[in-house]
Design a protein with these regions (language model features):
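Non-heme Fe(II)/2-oxoglutarate
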Residues: 2-22, 66, 72, 192, ...
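Non-heme Fe(II)-dependent double-stranded beta-helix
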Residues: 2-39, 45-143, 149-152, 190, ...
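Double-stranded beta-helix
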Residues: 12, 16, 168-232, 256
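Conserved hydrophobic/aromatic beta-strand scaffold that supports enzyme active sites
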Residues: 25, 41-43, 160-164, 214-216, ...
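Short helix-to-loop capping/linker segments positioned immediately adjacent to catalytic or ligand/cofactor-binding
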Residues: 100, 113-114, 148-151, 163-166, ...
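Short, surface-exposed loop/helix-turn segments at secondary-structure junctions
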Residues: 145-146, 195-211, 243, 262-269
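Short, conserved beta-strand element in jelly-roll/cupin
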Residues: 151-170, 218-219, 250-253
Length: 316
């Protein structure tokens, strides 16, 4: 069954707030929002507890098998996207369609509330990603900006939440960020694998200097890191004896549209590209959080990011 037809939680992975008051328990503080505005990322948001982690790891083990009955539903599936010799980087998109817990992860209350505050409006799923770096030979993900791959959607009103399924440390290839790089503007695509520092060729001297002092998002399993679509980020090899598995949930503010005309002659794999000018909605872009219905009058009590990952309301 293709679970993308189900636009509500289908398992008991999460306990959902039953009132607007309970939603406020998940709200980010003004200080956290300020950190996001300043740095372009925000670590330390608990998304999954140990039981939920085990459910997701079990489902990841199932869907990574190309013989999984739902395999054809993946938007992309790369058993090894690494370019380096003797390195492995599993990467896939679209797993939310295949298994119940993977389907329900975007409906995490903590994820939904943070996304609303950081995007400044109603939230839709854009797409998910799975990353696996096996022990001792996990490959890199080079420095990049997410939106450089997403310019087929506009305006820029996007957000990502990176959720490790294993404790993430430098030695097993945790995500790393360049603080403040979300203010550098849109950079050219220089590749996701191969040369970790390929993006440096597109930077000025000050920006190249900033690459020398990245912030390593060392977080426990289940603790998410949110980042802006222009924040430069990447991850080094996993040379440890432990795996580094992670799920990324990519989100958009409701109202983002397709700019698919720029994709002419470009490989889009099995991604559900909508016609030019069409608002992202329908089967593959479910509405996750509607602040008016979930928060009601309490909406005014919830702080929003001043320089959010989305443009102002009149631009969307």
């Amino acid at each position: 069954m293709n679970l993308s037809t189900r636009h509500e939680p289908i398992s008991e992975l999460f306990n959902y707030p039953s009132s607007s008051h309970e939603w406020t328990d998940y709200a980010l503080s003004s200080e956290q929002l300020q950190d996001f505005d300043e740095n372009g990322f925000l670590p330390g948001i608990r998304i999954l507890d140990p039981t939920q982690l085990e459910q997701l790891k079990a489902e990841l083990d199932k869907v990574i098998d190309p013989e999984h009955p739902g395999h054809s539903l993946f938007y992309e599936f790369h058993l090894n996207e690494a370019e380096e010799e003797n390195r492995v980087l599993f990467h896939a998109l679209g797993a939310w369609q295949l298994e119940p817990a993977l389907h329900d992860l975007p409906w995490s209350p903590a994820l939904q509330m943070a996304a609303y505050q950081l995007l400044g409006g109603a939230v839709r799923l854009f797409h998910d990603q799975l990353f696996v770096k096996p022990p001792e030979h996990g490959g890199i993900v080079a420095w990049h900006q997410d939106y450089s791959y997403w310019t087929w959607t506009e305006p820029m009103a996007h957000l990502s939440c990176w959720i490790p399924l294993d404790d993430a440390r430098v030695e097993n290839g945790c995500l790393q960020y360049i603080p403040g790089s979300h203010r550098w503007g849109l950079l050219p695509i220089t590749g996701l694998t191969g040369d970790m520092n390929a993006a440096s060729a597109t930077l000025d001297d000050r920006q190249r200097k900033a690459l020398e002092t990245p912030f390593a998002a060392e977080v426990p399993a289940g603790v998410g890191v949110f980042h802006h679509p222009l924040t430069l980020h990447g991850s080094t090899e996993n040379l440890s004896s432990r795996p580094r598995r992670a799920i990324v949930i990519n989100l958009v503010r409701d109202g983002v549209r397709s700019n698919a005309d720029i994709l002419a002659d470009k490989e889009t794999h099995n991604f559900p590209i909508l016609p030019q000018g069409t608002t992202l909605s329908g089967q593959y872009y479910p509405l996750l959080f509607q602040p008016d219905s979930e928060l009601g009058e309490r909406r005014t009590e919830i702080p929003l990011a001043e320089n959010s990952a989305a443009p102002s309301t009149d631009q969307v």
